[in-house]
């Protein structure tokens, strides 16, 4: 399924979430041990990907890629053991597997004591995301299961002509996630990406229960807010679309500055929500909603 059609059918554009570290320029390159920046989640995240490190499909025409790195603590040097690393990307034809039991080009793996992860897959390709928009080749990642803040991000590849056209990859905060592609002794492509996590900041459990539930939005769509790890996820008309970090005062905010969600708790036990996001035309859209269904504690 093509990304634009998938998003259109879900009423809202798909954006992910997070809070970013700064990027430092040393006169030659962007460097430093600041937290890895987040990126859009996109509409194609599927939880429950199988634990495996070899994603290559028989008969693939894609270029073999070894994708590896180290997950580090907030100090930028201490390896994070047992972090859950999830990746997902399109196939060599620019299509995501959204429905099969095989979870094609989707995988999960836990880091070892050295904090390292490694996947053998193929290099994804750019794909059309509308009549005029082409997304550059990228790999989605989610890092969770640690005592630090969960992370949703993407990596891109140097030399991709579509990077400058894309709202996410062209953002200055994505610069240290545009990676070199090397080769190993077998002439297979190699990409390395080290990840630095940051301090966890979460809403307390009681307050989380008050805001989670099903909301009817002002555009008549249904937004289902729920907790996953230390983030607030939302399903739009049944599809997982976003994963947001807590910012304080019942507010959650998305990565690259594209989305914010503000909750208002009512005296009768209900709740309201105000969602603001930037669409593909870089215009701000605001929706409001009322909680219509509360989940059991």
Predicted feature descriptions by range:
Residues 1-17:
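N-terminal secretory signal peptides and thylakoid transit peptides that target proteins
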Residues 27-169:
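Beta-strand-dominated extracellular/periplasmic modules and repeats
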Residues 84, 106-108, 116-118, 152-154, ...:
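Well-ordered beta-strand positions in beta-sheet-rich domains
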Residues 20-24:
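C-terminal segment of classical bacterial N-terminal signal peptides
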Residues 67, 139, 153, 177, ...:
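Hydrophobic residues positioned within well-ordered beta-strands of beta-sheet architectures
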Residues 196-297:
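Peripheral terminal and inter-domain segments
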Residues 70, 86, 142, 194-196, ...:
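Residue-level recognition of well-ordered beta-strand positions that form the cores
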Residues 53-58, 162-202, 259:
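Extracellular beta-sheet/turn segments enriched in Thr/Pro/Gly and aliphatic residues
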């Amino acid at each position: 399924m093509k990304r634009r059609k998938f998003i259109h059918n879900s009423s809202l554009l798909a954006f992910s979430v997070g809070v970013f570290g700064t990027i430092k320029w040393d006169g030659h390159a962007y460097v430093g041990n600041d937290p890895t920046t987040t990126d859009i989640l996109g509409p194609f995240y599927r939880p429950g990907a199988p634990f495996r490190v070899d994603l290559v499909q028989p008969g693939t025409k894609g270029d073999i890629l070894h994708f590896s790195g180290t997950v580090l603590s907030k100090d930028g040097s201490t390896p994070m053991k047992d972090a859950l690393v999830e990746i997902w990307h399109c196939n060599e034809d620019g299509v995501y597997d959204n429905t099969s039991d095989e979870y094609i080009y989707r995988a999960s793996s836990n880091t070892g004591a050295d904090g390292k992860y490694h996947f053998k897959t193929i290099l994804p390709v750019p794909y059309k995301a509308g009549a005029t928009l082409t997304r550059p080749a990228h790999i989605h990642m989610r890092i969770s299961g640690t005592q630090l803040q969960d992370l949703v991000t993407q990596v891109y590849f140097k030399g991709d002509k579509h990077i400058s056209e894309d709202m996410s990859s062209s953002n200055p905060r994505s610069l240290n996630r545009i990676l070199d592609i090397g080769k190993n002794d077998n002439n297979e492509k190699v990409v390395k990406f080290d990840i630095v996590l940051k301090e966890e900041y979460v809403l307390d459990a009681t307050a989380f229960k008050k805001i989670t539930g099903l909301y009817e939005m002002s555009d008549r769509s249904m937004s289902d807010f729920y907790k996953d790890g230390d983030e607030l996820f939302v399903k739009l008309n049944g599809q997982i679309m976003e994963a947001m970090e807590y910012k304080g005062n019942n507010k959650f905010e998305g990565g690259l500055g594209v989305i914010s969600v503000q909750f208002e708790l009512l005296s009768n036990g209900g709740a309201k929500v105000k969602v603001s996001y930037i669409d593909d035309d870089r215009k701000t859209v605001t929706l409001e909603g009322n909680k219509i269904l509360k989940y059991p504690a």
